[in-house]
Amino acid sequence: MPDMLGTGLSSLRALQRALDTTAHNIANVATPGYSRQDVQFDTRRPSVVGSNWIGNGVNVSEVRRIYDQFLTAQSRSSSGNLARLDAFATQAARLDNMLGDTTNGLSASLQGYTDALSEVSSTPGSIPARQVLLSEGRALAQRIVAYDGRLREMSADIDTRFAGEASEVTLLAQGIARLNGEITVAAQNTGHAPNDLLDQRDRLIDQISGKVSVTTVNEGDSINVFIGNGQPLVLGVTASEITTVTDPFDPERTQFALLTSSGTVDISRGVSGGTLGGLLDWRREMLEPARNELGRISLAIASQVNAQHREGMDLTGALGGDFFSVGGVGVTDVTTNTGTAVVSATRTNVAAITGTDYVLARTGTGYTLRRQDTGAAVTFTGTGTALDPILADGLSIVAGAGAATGDQFIIHPTRDAAVGFKVAITDPSRVAAAAPIRASAATSNAGNGTISTGEVLNATNAQLLTTANIVFTSATQYSVSGGPAQTYTPGGNIDVNGWRVQIGGAPATGDTFTIRSNAGATGDNRNAIALGDGLGAGVLDGGTTSVASAVARLTADVGLQTRTAQVNRDAEAVVNEDDLAARDSVSGVNLDEEAAAMLRYQQAYQAAAQVIAISSTLFDSLLNAVRR
């Protein structure tokens, strides 16, 4: 039966809930992930009085969570993408700052070495000039080794960060599982899920998404979270653990695994998005290519300088040796191999060396070779034995006996080159600035024939420094050191004992031209000039890219990638800001609206209190009337 007091009391209770909820909204205006709550009122069932229905007041049917699943998912996705791009751009900037140092960078060190070569060319007999060349060579080597060390440190830093991020993801997953349990129990007891716990759970999912991309599936009052290629991170009240393990393909690299009740699952290839995805992308797209390219540049410098230096002569009269040395080709056995084969590799042609690693895999009948970066198959010759090595992309690969089907080996052509880069000579007198041979025409020659200075074709020829005489037996024929007669072609190549000369003009019968060792020619700078010219010649990419161009390209590529990453990050930040604003426009707390609601509920509450007061007055009047 309706009564004024009951109606007023129901109103007071409902409005008290509304005021409490509004105050709760205001209190959480700055709480990340908080969704605004709104009290839903329902009219109480009316009572029949006579022939009329009289109302009985109001009930609170629900404290509703103002939530849009689409907007939440959209903002979560853009936040995760922003975290990925920010992690990539931040690491890219570190790499760019290192390689782009114009004062102490690789280009500056290379220029210092080139300038020292020019000084030796100007004063080839100067010991101080040669000493400066060695010093600049060491400075260049130290810069390359330092860069390689810094890149390795960056890789180690990333691995350390991976371990920390994996632990945080595990803790967040455990928090979600715990909240799943609490929400389920609360919903079963009251019929409604607790809004604040739902917000907390969504907040944890947002935080995980900021670290790694995940997908969610609702199951009752719980949310299941999946990572990678669909591996379960959270199932109901059970959370799996993410950990870091050593990559079986590379002991220097860390990858991710999921520890579940049924065992360990490799999820590395499926990890994307968030901070972890950004770091993985940066390692794959920038860090590892930069390390390989730095090694390739080291190979180019050593190959070009050494080849020319071996064709020169030092102050002691000896042929030049290697000026620089580099690290060898690295080979890594995959940890899952079951065979006993030992694989080794050497470089045969620096011009054909690429900046990628390779995977050599044993099949039932032989081997396959593919690029590790793209997975593309590589054409090769040979079977892999010592007498018939596998030849591909400037490499010679020998696989020993004992490989089992499925065994894999990772070939690193350039990665270890930089760490072993150093100057191979210490004595300045051993700098081979001079050409090893000199050619001259006899002063008694009657003709007007001239001879070139000569060039070395094969510095390993045992007869290279043996004196040879070219004697013209007629105007059209000559012999070399008493050998058979040969037809004279003006300007034609004469190749003997590993050297080459050209004779021009019109030699007369009996004219003699002599090629001999250049020992003692301290003023000869021909090989020093050739050493400097060689650094500008093509040596990489099939002989089309010079050392200087390779250094400039590495710096430019890293700079371009960095700027692109920063632009992408800034653009995504705008998208994320819009997505968050769209979410907040629905779920966020608007203080103006809450203040208006508070005032409205306050006035209604006061009116309800007045209803109760009037009801009390009427009741008192009735009692007084009865007493009379």
Task: Annotate the PLM regions.
Residues 1-628:
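S/T-rich, low-complexity, solvent-exposed segments of bacterial secretion/appendage proteins
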